[in-house]
């Protein structure tokens, strides 16, 4: 009997999911993306070669893995075809192993135009989106007016829906945001190319996944972003437009909850965040700069610098509860090498001195909170590329053990560098 494993980020994304998914695909026959879009970049480094995947599941770099983009993903045909051609240029056979749900909502040029226009209009109050049309595409989905992949293969239906939808969005673009309209005819012409390229790859993804399950194959579900970017459970409104928690597997891939065997939560040994929004443990001093430099903390898609801070156990506890996380994978432990003192946030304190053990539910409610830290000694030895727990410095092992004690959950994997082999596996999710 096969196992079904979910890998998701427990913080604000950028936790290193791509490398871990790629590593775990040695035991998987199927890898599935189930939410988000091409706003999330998963960075892989294999034999010194760096690859950034945005839409295509990380399992694509394993020759025997079938990859699915499920219905919970908002899909930009332009971005997908560009990514396919980039991988094919590097010798990866994509089209024979990639399948796309007919029910994926499409990201079209007017979504991108709206996204950028809104961010510009909001000025200093901007959310800090990637400007790739993700939010507006999900808005169309929820408003029940989205064009989906399946519509592309019915020309008259697609043209009629697009004409009506573009009238609406162009009105907003031109009249409210004072931006140029998106041209209907050029978009219709471009969509003809998408039809021919996508046709061999589309299917009913949910039905295919259940066939794989019945055949006893191992299935890996690859999450994008992180728990605190979830539209419902994140630091609203500084969130993404999709559900990033484990429940999104059920809706976003059509896969029943009782079939999930293991949930692996990915967390950095510290905390990072891109864009605006609350960040209780953020470091604005030389330590924060040092972590950012050593960790090369720049967004894989946007190149924007990431904000860096201490490990926040308050946030992690809630992530574990929300997602029934089975075990953790701690990444970038080596970035902390050489620090004299490490801190873990174990609670928050409000302006009246009250101690809070859980994070608030709205971004504004973080404003007056300060982290309550527990200090631990750092280590001077290198942890880079260590592959055995016993070879880690004593203080590094103590740091990890304390995280386990605070969170009440095991650390099953550790990443000590960007390469596949720079990993310590204590308990494999598929075992």
Curated annotation (Swiss-Prot):
Co-factor: note: Binds 1 Mg(2+) ion per subunit.
Top enzyme class: ligase
Reaction(s) catalysed (UniProt annotation): IMP + L-aspartate + GTP = N(6)-(1,2-dicarboxyethyl)-AMP + GDP + phosphate + 2 H(+)
Biological process annotations from GO: 'de novo' AMP biosynthetic process; IMP metabolic process
Chain residues that bind IMP: 14-17, 39-42, 130, 144, 225, 240, 304
Protein localization: Cytoplasm
Cofactor or coenzyme needed: Mg(2+)
SMART domains per record: Adenylsucc_synt
Entry keyword set: Cytoplasm, GTP-binding, Ligase, Magnesium, Metal-binding, Nucleotide-binding, Purine biosynthesis
Binding residues annotated for substrate, in chain numbering: 300-306
Residues of the active site: 14 (proton acceptor), 42 (proton donor)
Highest taxon listed in the record's lineage: Bacteria
Binding site for GTP: 13-19, 41-43, 306, 332-334, 415-417
Alphabetized HAMAP family for the sequence: Adenylosucc_synth
Quaternary state and interactors: Homodimer.
Identification of the protein by name: Adenylosuccinate synthetase
Organism: Legionella pneumophila (strain Corby)
């Amino acid at each position: 009997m096969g196992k079904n494993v979910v890998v998701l980020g427990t913080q604000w994304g950028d936790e290193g999911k791509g490398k871990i998914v790629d590593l775990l695909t040695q035991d998987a026959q199927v890898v599935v993306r189930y939410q988000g879009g091409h706003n999330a970049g998963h960075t892989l480094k294999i034999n010194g070669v760096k690859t950034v995947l945005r839409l295509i599941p990380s399992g694509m770099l394993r020759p025997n893995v079938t990859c699915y983009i499920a219905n919970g993903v908002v899909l930009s045909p332009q971005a997908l075809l560009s990514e396919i051609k980039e991988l094919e240029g590097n010798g990866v056979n994509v089209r024979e192993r990639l399948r796309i749900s007919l029910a994926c909502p499409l990201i079209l040029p007017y979504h991108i135009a709206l996204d950028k226009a809104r961010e510009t209009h909001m000025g200093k109050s901007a959310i800090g989106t990637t400007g790739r049309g993700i939010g507006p595409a999900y808005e169309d989905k929820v408003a029940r007016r989205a064009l989906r992949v399946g519509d592309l293969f019915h020309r008259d239906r697609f043209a009629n829906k697009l004409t009506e939808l573009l009238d609406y969005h162009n009105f907003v673009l031109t009249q409210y945001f004072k931006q140029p309209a998106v041209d209907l005819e050029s978009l219709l012409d471009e969509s003809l190319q998408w039809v021919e390229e996508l046709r061999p790859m589309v299917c009913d993804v949910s039905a295919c996944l259940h066939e794989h399950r019945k055949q006893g194959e191992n299935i890996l579900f690859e999450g994008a972003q992180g728990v605190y970017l979830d539209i419902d459970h994140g630091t609203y409104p500084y969130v993404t437009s999709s559900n990033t928690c484990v429940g999104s597997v059920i809706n976003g891939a059509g896969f029943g909850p009782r079939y999930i065997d293991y949930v692996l939560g990915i967390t950095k040994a510290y905390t990072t965040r891109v864009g605006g929004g609350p960040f209780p443990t953020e470091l604005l001093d030389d330590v924060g700069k040092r972590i950012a430099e050593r960790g090369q903390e720049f967004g894989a898609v946007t190149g924007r610098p990431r904000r860096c801070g201490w490990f926040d156990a308050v946030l992690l506890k809630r992530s574990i509860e929300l997602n029934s996380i089975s075990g953790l994978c701690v990444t970038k432990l080596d970035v902390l090498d050489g620090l004299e003192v490490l801190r873990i946030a174990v609670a928050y304190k409000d302006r009246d001195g009250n101690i809070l053990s859980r994070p608030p539910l709205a971004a504004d409610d973080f404003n007056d909170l300060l982290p309550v830290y527990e200090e631990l000694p750092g280590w001077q030895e290198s942890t880079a590329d260590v592959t055995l727990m016993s070879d880690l410095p004593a203080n590094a092992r103590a740091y990890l053990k304390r995280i386990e004690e605070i969170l009440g959950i095991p650390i099953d994997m550790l990443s000590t560098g960007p390469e596949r082999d720079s990993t310590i596996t204590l308990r494999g999710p598929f075992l």
